[in-house]
C-alpha cells in the first residue's frame, strides 16, 4: 500500500510539472523557498533565515507524524522548493518517489539522518514486543558522508533493512549538528546571504549548547537515572547522550497504543520497585496507560516533548525547539530529583 501511495503521488507531481510550459514567477518576489518535513528542521530554518526566506512545514501542526501521508498538493509544494529538508528513514518512505518526480527542480536537498550516527530501535525489558528481540545487539550507524550536499543525486540508503530510531534531534548535541547542516544547505542555495545565515545559526546553536550543559548537569547530579514511559519512547538519543536508563510500553516508532496486561504490570512493578516519582507520556501520545500506572502507584504523570510535530496551539504561540526542550528540562527535573 505504501508503494502504491508513493507512485500515485509521484505521478500526480510529474503531471503537474509537465503541465507547466514555463517556470512560474514566485509570488513573493523571489524569496528563497524552504520546505521541511518535520518541526525541528522548520524551527532551525526559520531561526537561521529570519525574514529573508519563506519556510514551510509540510507536516502541519496537530497532525500525527507516524500516520502522515503526503497529498498531491504537498508533492507540488516540495517540487517548488529551493531547499528541501527531510529526516529520512522508514517514516518518510515516500520522499524518494517525490524527489525522482521533481527531478532537478529542487536546488538543494538534505537528508538529516546522514549527518549524525543513527541508533537501532531498541526493545528493552518489559517493552511490548521485547520477547522477540535481542536486547544486546550492536547499535548501527549510517556510513560517514564526506559530502552532504545532495544536489538531488541518486542516493542509496538503508539497504540492509536495519530499523533505525528516527528521533535524532532529541539529543541536543545532535540538534547542534543538524542546525548547522540546515544552515549549510540554505547557504548553498543562497550564498549572497551566507554571512547573515551563519551568524544566526551560531547564535541559535549557542543557545542549544547552553541548554545542553544544563541537561548534563541535571542528569549528572540526579539521585537516580531511570525514566519510565507509559507510552512510546522517542527519546533514545536524548537518554543515550545523558546516560539515562529507561523502560517504556513501546519503542519510538511503534504504531501500537494498547499494551498487553504483562507490559502494564511490568511498568507498575518497576515504578513501585524503583520508587519512581514521575511516569512520562509524550506529546501526541496516549495518556490511558500512564493514568493506570499512576492510579496503581501514586506516581505523578508528566509529558516529554519529542517535537516531531507540535500542536496547533504551540505552533501559533511561536514555540521553538528551545522552549519545548525547556519544558522537557522542567519535567525531567521533577522526575530525576524528587
Language-model region placement:
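Extracytoplasmic metal-acquisition and chelation regions
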Residues: 7-9, 20-338
Amino acid at each position: 500500500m505504501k508503494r502504491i501511495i508513493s507512485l500515485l503521488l509521484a505521478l500526480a507531481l510529474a503531471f503537474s510539472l509537465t503541465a507547466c510550459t514555463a517556470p512560474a514567477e514566485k509570488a513573493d518576489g523571489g524569496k528563497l523557498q524552504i520546505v521541511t518535513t518535520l518541526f525541528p528542521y522548520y524551527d532551525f530554518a526559520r531561526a537561521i533565515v529570519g525574514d529573508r526566506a519563506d519556510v514551510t512545514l509540510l507536516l502541519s501542526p496537530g497532525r500525527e507524524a507516524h500516520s502522515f501521508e503526503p497529498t498531491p498538493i504537498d508533492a507540488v509544494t516540495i517540487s517548488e522548493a529551493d531547499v528541501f529538508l527531510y529526516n529520512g528513514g522508514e517514516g518518510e518512505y515516500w520522499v524518494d518517489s517525490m524527489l525522482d518526480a521533481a527531478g532537478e527542480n529542487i536546488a538543494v536537498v538534505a537528508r538529516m539522518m546522514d549527518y549524525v550516527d543513527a541508533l537501532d530501535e531498541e526493545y528493552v525489558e518489559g517493552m511490548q514486543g521485547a520477547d522477540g528481540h535481542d536486547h544486546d545487539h550492536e547499535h548501527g550507524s549510517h556510513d560517514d558522508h564526506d559530502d552532504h550536499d545532495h544536489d538531488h543525486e541518486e542516493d542509496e540508503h538503508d539497504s540492509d533493512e536495519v530499523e533505525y530510531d528516527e528521533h535524532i534531534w532529541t539529543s541536543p548535541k545532535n540538534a547542534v549538528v543538524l542546525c548547522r547542516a540546515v544552515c549549510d544547505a540554505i547557504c548553498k542555495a543562497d550564498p549572497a546571504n551566507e554571512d547573515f545565515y551563519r551568524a544566526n545559526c551560531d547564535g541559535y546553536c549557542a543557545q542549544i549548547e547552553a541548554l545542553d550543559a544544563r541537561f548534563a548537569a541535571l542528569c549528572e547530579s540526579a539521585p537516580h537515572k531511570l525514566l519510565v514511559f507509559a507510552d512510546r519512547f522517542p527519546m533514545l538519543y536524548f537518554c543515550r547522550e545523558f546516560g539515562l536508563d529507561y523502560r517504556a510500553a513501546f519503542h519510538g516508532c511503534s504504531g501500537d497504543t494498547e499494551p498487553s496486561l504483562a507490559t502494564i504490570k511490568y511498568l507498575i512493578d518497576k515504578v513501585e520497585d524503583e520508587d519512581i516519582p514521575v511516569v512520562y507520556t509524550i506529546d501526541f501520545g496516549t495518556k490511558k496507560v500512564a493514568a493506570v500506572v499512576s492510579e496503581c502507584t501514586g506516581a505523578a504523570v508528566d509529558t516529554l516533548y519529542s517535537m516531531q510535530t507540535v500542536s496547533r496551539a504551540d505552533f501559533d504561540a511561536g514555540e521553538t525547539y528551545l522552549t519545548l526542550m525547556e519544558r522537557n528540562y522542567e519535567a525531567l527535573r521533577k522526575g530525576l530529583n524528587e
